[in-house]
């Protein structure tokens, strides 16, 4: 049980570090830039904080034993455990949540952050999503 608690604490700390990096980027740059600018700065913040990540990670579709590359890309995957989809749009829609949930299912990543930088306070543009644990 103690080992499980340690894993949960480590994961929570990592999530807080990631959200802190997002807040720092938004605080420094504010709204109004392209998504690509926020992504580059966010990745730099992750490096500064010592987190491993993959940028523009391909997401394949498994169909009848074949992995098909349809051009889907996840903006950032942090330490294989947190998927981050960045936006710089007027407002988040249900479609954007559906997009990240689909990426999470295809990537087998249980936690996602949907982030819209085009807001005055990042808390308004930050949405945490999670999938239930897989059962065998």
Question: Where are the model-predicted features located?
Answer:
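A short acidic/basic microdomain associated with nuclease active sites
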Residues: 47-64
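A cross-kingdom feature that marks ATP-driven nucleic-acid transaction machinery
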Residues: 43, 51-54, 94-99
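Short, low-complexity, charge-dense intrinsically disordered segments
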Residues: 1-10, 136
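Conserved catalytic cores of phosphodiester-cleaving nucleases, focusing on short active-site segments
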Residues: 30, 53, 74-92, 103
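Nucleic-acid nuclease catalytic cores
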Residues: 87-136
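Acidic pyrophosphate-coordinating catalytic loop
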Residues: 63-67, 122-123
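Nuclease catalytic cores
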Residues: 11-20, 31-35, 39, 43
């Amino acid at each position: 049980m103690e080992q499980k608690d340690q894993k949960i604490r480590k994961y929570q700390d990592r999530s807080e570090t990631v959200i802190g990096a997002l807040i720092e980027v938004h605080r420094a740059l504010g709204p109004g830039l392209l998504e690509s600018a926020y992504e580059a700065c966010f990745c730099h913040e992750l490096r500064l904080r010592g987190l491993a990540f993959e940028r523009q990670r391909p997401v394949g579709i498994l169909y009848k034993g074949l992995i098909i590359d349809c051009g889907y890309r996840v903006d950032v995957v942090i330490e294989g455990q947190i998927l981050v989809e960045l936006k710089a749009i007027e407002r988040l829609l249900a479609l954007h949540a559906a997009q990240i949930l689909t990426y999470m299912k295809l990537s087998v990543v249980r936690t996602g952050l949907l982030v819209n930088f085009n807001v005055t306070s990042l808390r308004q543009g930050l949405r945490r999503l999670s999938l239930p644990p897989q059962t065998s």
